């Protein structure tokens, strides 16, 4: 298992794109930022941190940060070994993280590792929810026919 960093957003997406798309519901923020970076958008003066942990052909953790903004994580919260590689790399690089985005179990696990490395005490600043469509229900067609609006419909239109 190793931490792999990327010099360009295109190389990053080539490697982690399939992983992110497979978990699109939870990785939409990370994926959106990466796609904007590929298109040439800049979020600050510093180069972005683009990384994944590789383990036997899989990416259990994907990380992205556009300084000075928060770290964004996607992956398996149970893989403390993989999260530890990300935390160790950032701590040894002297990074000061203002925050971490991701699923609560993932950010909690990372926060504990980060606290052990840096002494920074993590806290939840803003809880958010993400909804994912898992099933589409079809509905019956509406009965009726189209018609032009008339003056008697004014209250419905205005």
Feature locations, PLM:
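A short helix-loop-beta-strand connector motif used in the catalytic cores of GNAT acetyltransferases and
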Residues: 37-58
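Short, solvent-exposed polar/charged micro-motifs at secondary-structure junctions
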Residues: 13-17, 38-42, 109-113
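Exposed alpha-helical structural elements
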Residues: 11, 15, 29-33, 81-85, ...
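Short amphipathic alpha-helix that is part of the acyltransferase structural core
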Residues: 1-30, 136-158
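A generic alpha-helix structural signal
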Residues: 17-20, 34, 86-87, 111, ...
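Acyl-donor-binding surface of acyltransferase catalytic domains
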Residues: 55-60, 65-143
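A short, aromatic/hydrophobic, helix- or strand-capping loop or linear motif
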Residues: 26-36, 101
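A general structural signal for well-ordered secondary-structure junctions
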Residues: 25-26, 43, 96, 120
């Amino acid at each position: 298992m190793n931490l792999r960093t990327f010099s360009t957003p295109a190389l990053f997406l080539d490697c982690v794109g399939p992983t992110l798309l497979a978990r699109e519901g939870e990785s939409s923020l990370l994926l959106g930022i990466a796609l904007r970076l590929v298109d040439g958008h800049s979020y600050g003066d510093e180069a972005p941190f683009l990384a994944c942990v590789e383990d036997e052909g899989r990416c259990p953790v994907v990380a992205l940060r556009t300084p000075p903004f928060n770290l964004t994580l996607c992956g398996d919260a149970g893989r403390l070994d993989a999260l530890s590689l990300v935390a160790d790399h950032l701590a040894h690089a002297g990074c000061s993280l203002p925050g971490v985005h991701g699923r609560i179990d993932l950010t909690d696990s990372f926060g504990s590792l980060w606290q052990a490395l840096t002494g920074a005490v993590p806290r939840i600043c803003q809880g958010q929810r993400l909804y994912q469509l898992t099933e589409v229900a079809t509905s019956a067609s509406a009965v009726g026919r189209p018609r032009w609006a008339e003056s008697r419909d004014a209250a419905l239109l205005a």
